From Swiss-Prot:
InterPro entries linked to this entry: LYSM1-4 (IPR045030), LysM_dom_sf (IPR036779)
Organism per entry: Emericella nidulans (strain FGSC A4 / ATCC 38163 / CBS 112.46 / NRRL 194 / M139) (Aspergillus nidulans)
Annotated spans, Disordered: 1-107, 132-181, 207-231, 298-349, 384-464, 533-553, 568-623
Bias kind Low complexity: ranges: 39-49, 165-177, 400-417, 604-614
Protein name per its UniProtKB record: Uncharacterized protein AN12072
Length: 623
């Protein structure tokens, strides 16, 4: 080994002295320099298949570095990848190279380390290329584009083919980025246009959204409304229950198996109402748990069929006069005997008779009626019979003669014993509120049997007896030429009741207002008479009082005049008028002229001298 290295050194010195000044650049050197990688990469690869593992590191320092040669542009870049025929396996490890360079031989340990580092670096580079993608033309250290592209590893190749194959099928995505493109105003305008387009293209048929609340409907909803009205117009079956005196809402609902809430809704009961206020109540058949068996009524028998098949109406016991009573017949006859009976006081009969059924636990058959379904779910009622009025309505239970009730003469003729019954018939009248309530002529409701006649509404005079216009000249003229428009005359017995309204009110009126007015008038009359009597008495007795007074008192004069308060009883005034010889006693301390509880000054004193004089007089009286 040492002999080899020594011969190499002598040969190198000889070649340097002989060949170095005459060194020429051959085409092989140019080809080698163009195909060699730059030193920055640190790795140079060869395309020959004969050298799969032999590589030289450009970073390894050479003991005899040569002068750098300026690169020559490649005319044929593809030649860099062509295999070289003159490459030899031993050139990279030492000895002479084709370009005349001498390389120091590596030891076996150095060669193994270089091979290990090359393998590790190539593996790391393959992993990095697979993650970052294939190598593209990168700029080299001298600024030119990289001509040699490394062959991609297998994972990168597979990933590239997979990506290419994935993009060849399926729907193509948007070619231009549309998210956040344009200004904010343009995006808002686009959103508004999209919403308007969706609104115009939407389905306007409301049949898909029947349960939603529409605030505005158009002509397209007519079909839906007609369909809903058809459903509401369908008839439902109900049990018609005749209310008994012992029935309660809870008992009836338990007996029929119906919920109390449904029962109250169908019949229009408030929570505080009682079932006794009705004569008939309805219970929906589909909401009740009990079912009945149909019963054939006697009225439904065909009268045109043969006589032998007709059921016998004779008593089986032998009586041919009185037919045998049956529960069905008794029930039907009882109901048919009352054709004019109103089922409810508040409203008319809303059901139509359908059939009769026999229910277990019921002594008599139960009637089944048919009512519109909208009547079962509407509450409260829209109209009551008590407030409805009709001119052709017959008056039941009272006379046709109208009853007169006015403020000036509240006396009513008691021509019928049913008048009190009629007053108690109305639920709203004060007479029916309690057993001890007193009748009030002023606030009593006018009976509905009073017919209005004539033109106009009448005058506001307190002496009006009947509704209608007053009997003036115009009314008399129309009464002569148009008898139908003439106002009706007062009843014959009304003349005897006319007279002084105050006298009638003071004698026969039971109204509190009339009594109060009469008492007030009487008190005013008595007070006025008492005042006049006192004034006359004071003027007549002034001379006698002056004579009885002492001289100094007479000189001062009696300037303090007094009068009695309002409301003095008549007996006091009569006593004052009867006593002609009465003189005031000024010597007593309890005189009526100085009593502050019952007297008041008519002319109050304006000077302190007068008050001082009155004080001295009082002191004299007290002594």
């Amino acid at each position: 080994m040492s002999s080899r290295s020594g011969s190499a050194d002598t040969f190198t010195q000889r070649s340097d002295s002989n060949l170095r000044p005459r060194r020429l650049i051959s085409l092989d050197d140019v080809r080698d320099n163009n195909g060699r990688q730059p030193s920055s990469s640190g790795i140079s690869t060869t395309g020959s298949s004969e050298l799969p593992t032999l590589r030289s590191r450009g970073a390894t320092p050479s003991p005899r570095p040569s002068r750098n040669v300026s690169p020559i542009p490649m005319g044929h870049p593809s030649r860099a990848t062509q295999p070289r025929s003159d490459a030899r396996p031993g050139n990279s490890l030492g000895g002479f190279t084709p370009n005349g360079k001498y390389q120091d031989p590596f030891t076996e340990s150095s060669r193994a380390a270089v091979d290990f580092l090359d393998a590790s670096w190539s593996s790391l580079q393959g992993i990095a290329s697979s993650l970052l993608g294939s190598d593209t033309a990168r700029p080299t250290s001298n600024g030119g584009p990289r001509s040699h592209a490394r062959k991609p590893s297998r994972p990168d190749y597979l990933a590239k083919h997979r990506a290419v194959s994935t993009s060849t099928w399926g729907p193509s995505g948007p070619t231009t980025p549309e998210i956040g493109a344009g200004t904010q105003d343009e995006r808002q305008a686009m959103v508004h246009a999209k919403k308007m387009e969706a609104l115009l293209l939407a389905d306007t048929d409301p049949s898909w959204n029947l349960n939603s609340r529409h605030k505005r409907r158009d002509s397209n909803d007519r079909t839906v409304q007609s369909r809903a009205d058809t459903d509401q117009d369908e008839e439902a079956l109900v049990y018609v229950h005749q209310v008994q005196p012992t029935d309660t809402i809870t008992g009836v609902t338990i007996r029929y198996g119906c919920q109390a809430a449904i029962f109250r809704k169908v019949n229009g009961f408030w929570p505080s109402d009682s079932i006794q206020a009705r004569k008939t109540v309805l219970l929906p058949v589909d909401c009740c748990s009990i079912k009945g068996r149909p019963v054939k009524a006697r009225e439904e028998t065909d009268l045109l069929q043969d006589v032998p098949s007709r059921p016998s109406i004779e008593d089986p016991s032998g009586s041919s006069i009185v037919p045998a009573p049956s529960p069905e017949k008794s029930t039907f006859s009882r109901i048919s005997e009352q054709p004019g009976t109103e089922p409810e006081a508040e409203s008319d009969q809303i059901w139509k008779h359908e059939s009769w059924v026999q229910i277990d636990g019921f002594a008599e058959p139960v009637e089944i009626g048919r009512v519109p379904r909208r009547a079962l779910g509407f509450f409260p009622r829209t109209r009551r019979k008590s407030v409805s009025y009709s001119d052709s309505e017959p008056v039941r239970g009272r006379l046709q003669t109208p009853t007169i009730s006015t403020a000036s003469s509240p006396i009513q003729p008691s021509s019928s014993p049913n008048a009190d019954q009629h007053d108690s018939y109305h639920a709203g009248s004060p007479a029916s509120r309690g057993p001890g309530s007193k009748p009030k002529g002023r606030h009593r409701r006018r009976p509905s049997g009073l017919e209005l006649s004539g033109t106009g509404v009448g005058t506001l005079d307190r002496n009006v007896n009947l509704p209608g216009p007053a009997m003036d000249g115009l009314s008399k003229f129309f009464a002569q030429h148009l008898p139908t428009l003439a106002p009706k005359q007062a009843p014959p017995n009304f003349d005897s009741l006319s007279g002084n309204s105050s006298t009638v009110a003071s004698i026969n009126s039971t109204s509190l207002d009339s009594i109060g007015g009469a008492v007030e008038g009487w008190v005013r009359k008595i007070t006025a008479r008492a005042k006049s009597s006192i004034n006359d008495l004071q003027q007549g007795t002034s001379s006698s009082q002056n004579q009885a007074m002492p001289p100094e008192t007479r000189r001062r004069g009696f300037s303090d005049l007094i009068e009695l308060e309002d409301g003095v009883e008549s007996r006091n005034s009569s006593g004052l008028l009867a006593g002609t010889g009465w003189k005031p006693d000024l010597t007593r301390s309890g005189s009526g002229y100085v009593n502050g509880a019952n007297l008041r000054e008519r002319f109050p004193s304006a000077s302190p001298s007068t008050s001082r004089t009155r004080t001295g007089l009082d002191r004299t009286k007290g002594d």
